[in-house]
Amino acid sequence: DKDAKTLTVTDRGIGMTADEVERYINQIAFSSAEEFMEKYKNQAIIGHFGLGFYSAFMVADKVEIFTRSYKEGAKTVHWSCEGSPEYEMEETTEQRDRGTTIVLHLSADTLEYGEDSKVEELLRKYCRFLPVPIAFGKVKEWKDGKYVDTNKDNIINNIAPLWTVKPTEITAEQYKDCLLYTSPSPRDGL
């Protein structure tokens, strides 16, 4: 939301309970994170222990999490932090679908991350081959002399890249599509 100066990421996954937020989000930040990072600095720990989550504070002054677990009777959990060891967390009666929403309140010097073009560029660069569909906006179609959004999600990644398929099962059209999708100058190889 460019006007609100926020970047919001939502999934429809299994969500988290308050105990899980405490364990997975607060565990590193409030249990000697510097010591932990020093100890494991030479190991590939990105994607573990919630460390990637804390990189959000590189672009945000404040981060909020709204999450609701798939577990029966689960309540929505709201977690909020402004980058210090202090945070707020509460269970609310707000009805939300199962899953997690993370809201980054962008800092003044990182507002470019509120621009659709910048977000799409980063998603295509870093999420291009993730095994789950990543939707960003809606597919646009030409109607009455202008592009308009449809109800169809704009999936920006390829969840089944060619290297996951047996070569004997790949068609010439699939090779061509892969080249167009991955090459900076796709016409060179056609």
Model segments located where?
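Single conserved hydrophobic/aromatic residue that forms the stacking wall/gate
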Residues: Y181-L190
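GHKL (Bergerat-fold) ATPase N-terminal catalytic module, capturing the glycine-rich phosphate-binding loop
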Residues: D1-A108, E112-G114, E121, R128
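ATP-binding catalytic core of ATPases
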Residues: E86-G145, D149-L180
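Short, exposed beta-strand "edge-strand" segments with a Pro/Gly-rich flavor and a Y/T-containing core
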Residues: T10-M16, F30, P161-I170, G189
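Secondary-structure boundary/capping residues
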Residues: E34, V132-A135, G189
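Flexible, glycine-rich phosphate/dinucleotide-binding loops
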Residues: E72, K143, G189
